[in-house]
């Protein structure tokens, strides 16, 4: 069952709007129906015969339903599907519209009429017809938009009090009137004293000039460059950089803006990276520093089930290439161990360097010799990524397992582009994009399993890591394992390749694994 849903507005708790059931090709099966309360209508449908909702974009439409207590199982996100199809067609992605990223506001969906939504869906169905893998990608991407909206709405359990203690311990008491924290002010003074005059330690130009006055030519203020200097200002400058980053990125203003009611509520952006990986807006959800993870604390009676897919990209390469020996190696708990045993005399470190080198295009120096050895043992796996690299060097477009296309080279590539850089990009794209698809399929499957028996909530997702907040860790872990197996079969069929998840259960995200 498919139902097109077009709100008149997504603002408020109970938007009104139109719905119409359609067939697999997007043809209406009945007359359009207007609803004064779409939230109640959607909730009723989900309790009886849940359809796949077809709407303009989850990010703008779904929040109103979440606020009204209506959650949906499946949708077809026209915006994310259009983005996938446009890249495949070589159509440049338009710049994003300005979005108010402050959390908690009642966003208003862009206006759309029912006829245009029906026409868009019908066009997309034509483009997807007969392309089973691409249809799977679109379904997974749409499911990802639902998970992203729900995780942003529900939030990640976060102790504001613990975070304030971290800030005060590290930066000193909160400054008034948005001034600098005491520790940073103190460092400014100490750095000025070392150089004999006041300067702004955050200014690249002023720091270089200060060193130059002392007869020291420094090419940049990067950490690795500064660490090579024997100068009393260096440790102070490095400390200043760390404290300034904490203050500006996750300081008191960040806490006031993004943490409410004991939850960190970021804005996740599925498919924001060309490979299909996610990004985040405003709250920096995908970049929480280690020092702040101690503030991510499960609610009473709950724990976090934290799952990380180790060695994901090498295992994806094994499954994609079908290389018999690499597939066998990827059936082991540690993929590098059998690779080391068969090719590098048991040296696991060399095996890891070789495998990662072939994935990322490290083909010079020691890596070249290791690659030659790897090619002898795993010719099909090596040829798979090298074929993608050669295509990139020729300016061609390559695709993930399910059909996500990489962007074409820019207009000047054939005249003066860096063919080798393009080749390194396409070499990794085919694997990284497929890894993103696998992780997205796991996330989509797990989301439905958790909801079916109220076994927990998804609260964090980053590339190859998933975090569930739950009262029943055993059940959540079982659902996770089932989702991994399901996603693997869905993408690769009856493969020998295993995707073992490193699972830990913790009360605090930043604590040592139990």
Pin down the residues of each PLM region.
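Conserved "right-hand" nucleotidyltransferase catalytic core of DNA-directed polymerases
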Residues: 1-29, 118-288, 301-303, 386-390, ...
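Non-catalytic interaction-recognition regions
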Residues: 157, 309, 469-470
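Generic structural signal for residues in well-ordered beta-strands
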Residues: 72-75, 458, 499-503
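Helical catalytic core of nucleic-acid polymerases
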Residues: 78-134, 141-154, 204-205, 221-224, ...
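Hydrophobic multi-pass inner-membrane translocation pores used for secretion
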Residues: 1-21, 25-35, 305, 313-317, ...
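Conserved DEDDh/DEDDy metal-dependent 3′-5′ exonuclease domain
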Residues: 2, 12-130, 135, 311
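C-terminal polymerase-core module
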Residues: 175-176, 185-230, 362-369, 376-383, ...
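Acidic, glycine-rich two-metal-ion catalytic cores of nucleic acid-processing enzymes
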Residues: 197-346, 401-465, 480-488
């Amino acid at each position: 069952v498919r139902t097109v849903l077009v709100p008149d507005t997504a603002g408020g708790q109970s938007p009104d709007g139109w719905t119409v059931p359609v067939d697999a090709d997007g043809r209406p099966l009945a007359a359009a129906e207007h609803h004064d309360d779409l939230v109640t209508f959607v909730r009723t449908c989900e309790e009886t015969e849940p359809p796949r909702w077809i709407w303009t974009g989850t990010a703008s439409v779904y929040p109103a339903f979440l606020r009204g207590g209506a959650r949906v199982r499946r949708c077809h996100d026209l915006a994310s599907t259009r983005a996938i199809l446009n890249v495949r067609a070589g159509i440049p992605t338009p710049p994003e519209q300005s979005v108010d990223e402050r959390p908690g506001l009642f966003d208003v969906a862009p206006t759309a009429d029912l006829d245009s939504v029906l026409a868009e869906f019908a066009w997309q169905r034509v483009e997807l017809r007969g392309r089973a893998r691409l249809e799977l990608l679109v379904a997974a991407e749409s499911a990802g938009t639902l998970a992203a909206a729900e995780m942003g709405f529900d939030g990640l359990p976060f102790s504001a009090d613990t975070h304030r203690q971290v800030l005060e311990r590290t930066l000193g008491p909160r400054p008034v009137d948005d001034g600098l924290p005491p520790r940073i002010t103190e460092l400014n003074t100490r750095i000025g004293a070392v150089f004999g005059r006041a300067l702004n330690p955050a200014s690249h130009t002023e720091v270089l000039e200060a060193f130059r006055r002392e007869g020291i030519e420094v090419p940049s203020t990067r950490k690795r460059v500064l660490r090579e200097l024997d100068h009393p200002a260096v440790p102070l400058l490095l400390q200043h950089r760390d404290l300034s980053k904490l203050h500006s990125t996750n300081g008191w203003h960040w806490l006031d803006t993004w943490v409410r009611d004991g939850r960190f509520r970021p804005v996740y952006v599925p498919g924001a990276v060309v490979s299909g990986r996610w990004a985040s807006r405003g709250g920096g959800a995908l970049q929480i520093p280690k020092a702040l993870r101690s503030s991510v604390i499960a609610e009473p009676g709950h724990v976090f089930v934290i799952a990380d897919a180790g060695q994901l990209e090498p295992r994806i390469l094994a499954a994609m290439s079908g290389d018999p020996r690499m597939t066998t190696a990827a059936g082991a708990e540690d993929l590098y161990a059998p690779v080391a045993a068969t090719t590098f005399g048991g040296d696991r470190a060399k095996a890891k360097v070789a495998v990662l080198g072939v994935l990322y295009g490290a083909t010079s120096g020691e890596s070249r010799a290791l690659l030659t050895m790897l090619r002898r043992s795993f010719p099909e796996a090596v040829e798979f990524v090298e074929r993608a690299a050669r295509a990139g060097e020729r300016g061609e477009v390559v695709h993930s397992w399910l059909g996500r296309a990489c962007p074409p080279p820019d207009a000047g590539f054939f005249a003066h582009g860096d063919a080798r850089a393009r080749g390194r990009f396409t070499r990794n794209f085919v694997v990284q994009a497929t890894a993103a698809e696998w992780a997205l399929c796991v996330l989509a499957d797990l989301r439905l399993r958790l909801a079916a028996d109220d076994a927990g909530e998804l609260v964090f997702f980053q590339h190859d890591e998933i975090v569930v907040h739950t009262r029943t860790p055993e059940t959540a872990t079982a659902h996770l394992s089932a989702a991994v197996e399901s996603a693997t079969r869905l993408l690769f069929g009856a493969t020998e390749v295993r995707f073992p998840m490193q699972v830990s259960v913790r009360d605090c995200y930043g604590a040592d694994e139990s």
